UniProtKB/Swiss-Prot annotation:
Catalytic activity: L-citrulline + L-aspartate + ATP = 2-(N(omega)-L-arginino)succinate + AMP + diphosphate + H(+)
Assembly, per entry: Homotetramer.
Source taxonomy: Bacteria, Bacillati, Bacillota, Clostridia, Eubacteriales
Similarity annotation: Belongs to the argininosuccinate synthase family. Type 1 subfamily.
HAMAP family: Arg_succ_synth_type1 (MF_00005)
Provenance organism: Clostridium botulinum (strain Alaska E43 / Type E3)
InterPro entries documented for this protein: Arginosuc_syn_C (IPR048268), Arginosuc_syn_N (IPR048267), Arginosuc_synth (IPR001518), Arginosuc_synth_CS (IPR018223), Arginosuc_synth_type_1_subfam (IPR023434), AS_cat/multimer_dom_body (IPR024074), Rossmann-like_a/b/a_fold (IPR014729)
Binding, L-citrulline: Y88, S93, N124, R128, S177, S186, E263, Y275
Name of the protein in question: Argininosuccinate synthase
Binding site residues for L-aspartate: T120, N124, D125
GO biological process: argininosuccinate metabolic process; L-arginine biosynthetic process; urea cycle
Membrane-spanning intervals of the chain: none
Length: 407
């Protein structure tokens, strides 16, 4: 392979990126600069710099992207109501563009020849990373070892790491593929690859209790929203990162947001994963219910179509595109009145709306009551039905006329 002077590596400290450091040095005779995007992995970041240097990197950039991640990527996606295939809250999908953008920025500072990532050739993340890089530096060389090297499986990776004394925490028996950030934790591989197998939740779950271990009494919380963003929990104002952290703790305790799904990957195959998204699931539910109170019918119905498209764009790595940006502007406009307070009951994986209020509520008890009211003349419905049903009547009479002619 051609010699390179300096390569920027998207580094997590996991198995893939740990063995890529010696592989790059062996194959390109280059300096490797590791970059870790901190998007809320917490304890996974402990000792990362020491590990990267010990493995062969010249330095490690530890970039704290958590605030930007929550405010500029997570919250706009919540406002959009974007959920991929009805289940996946896009935990990995919207983290990759942000990290990819930062990789390009550091590559320019360092004068690097290439950017390298550890995504497999079967996954979605290779697309997300590389499209982000191309969006900010279309001429940057990208190295994707999984598409080049002789390593064919995670078992091969472990063997490679052991032969080069690369420190790893996993082994052949507990080799789940995981991705963690402040929004979620995903689990893939091993027994999960066969959809007939029930997930071993007591062994897999890290952020959440299983349903069986969740408290036998419900937990009540109150969330306050301003223009579509959660700003307070139980009456206490919080920044976005702190609020999500607190919801993760509360939701995890009550087994909220555990999803087992088979999804359609961008690259053409189906894959199965178990996702833990405790705080995010609470925010989605609260935001959606408050929108029901505050959005008019036409906006609400049209926004459902936008939500589906927005989810596809994010999942497919198209965050930095004119369409995603345009949809975000539309969504931002719809959120101007999504302000209010909602009380939620959390119990063994369930989230129940326990009451909500908003100064922009479009719900009128005077009009909606089943009791006697003085504002709604029910006789007006007759004229409405006559006009609304006119196309149906015209069509029915046309068929009646045709039947008479046939006779």
């Amino acid at each position: 392979m051609n010699k390179l002077n300096k390569v920027i590596l998207a580094y997590s400290g996991g198995l893939d990126t740990s063995i890529i450091i010696p592989w790059l040095k062996e194959n390109y005779n280059c300096e490797v600069i590791a970059v870790c995007g901190n998007v809320g992995q917490k304890d996974e970041l402990d000792g990362l710099e020491e590990k990267a240097i010990k493995t062969g990197a010249s330095k490690l950039y530890m970039e704290d992207l958590t605030k930007e991640f929550v405010e500029d990527y997570i919250f706009p996606t919540i406002q959009a109501g974007a959920i991929y295939e009805g289940k996946y809250l896009l935990g990995t999908s919207f983290a990759r563009p942000l990290i990819g953008k930062r990789l390009v920025e550091i590559a320019k500072v360092e004068g690097a020849d290439a950017i390298c990532h550890g995504c497999t050739g079967k996954g979605n993340d290779q697309v997300r990373f590389e499209l982000a890089v191309k969006a900010f530096d279309p001429d940057m060389k990208i190295i994707a070892p999984w598409r080049i090297w002789d390593i064919k499986s995670r078992e091969d990776e472990i063997t490679y790491a052991e032969a080069r004394n690369v420190p790893i925490k996993i082994n052949h028996e507990t080799n789940y593929s995981k991705d963690k950030n402040i929004w979620h934790l995903s689990h893939e591989g091993l027994d999960l690859e066969d959809p007939k197998n029930e997930p071993k939740y007591d062994e897999i779950l890290e952020l959440s209790n299983s349903l069986e271990k969740a408290p036998n009494e419900p937990t009540y919380i109150t969330l306050t929203f301003e223009k579509g963003n959660a700003v307070a929990l139980n009456g206490e104002k919080m920044d976005a990162v702190t609020l999500l952290d607190e919801l993760n703790k509360i939701g995890g305790k009550n087994a909220i947001g555990i999803t087992d799904m088979v999804e359609n990957r961008l690259v053409g195959m189906k894959s199965r994963g178990v996702y833990e998204t405790p705080g995010g699931t609470i925010l989605y539910k609260a935001h959606k219910d408050l929108e029901e109170l505050c959005l008019d019918k036409e906006t609400s119905h049209y926004k459902e179509q936008i939500s589906l498209k927005f989810a596809d764009l994010v999942y497919n790595g198209l965050w930095f595109t004119p369409l995603r940006e345009a949809l975000s502007e539309f969504i931002k406009k719809t959120q101007e009145t999504v302000t209010g307070e909602i009380k939620l009951k959390l119990y063994k994986g369930n989230i129940v709306n326990a009451g909500m209020t908003s100064p922009y509520s479009l719900y009128s008890e005077e009009y909606a009551t089943f009791g006697e009211d003085a504002v709604y003349n029910q006789n007006d419905s007759a004229g409405f039905i006559t006009l609304y049903g006119l196309p149906t009547v015209v069509k029915a009479k046309m068929y009646q006329s045709l039947k008479k002619e046939d006779k």
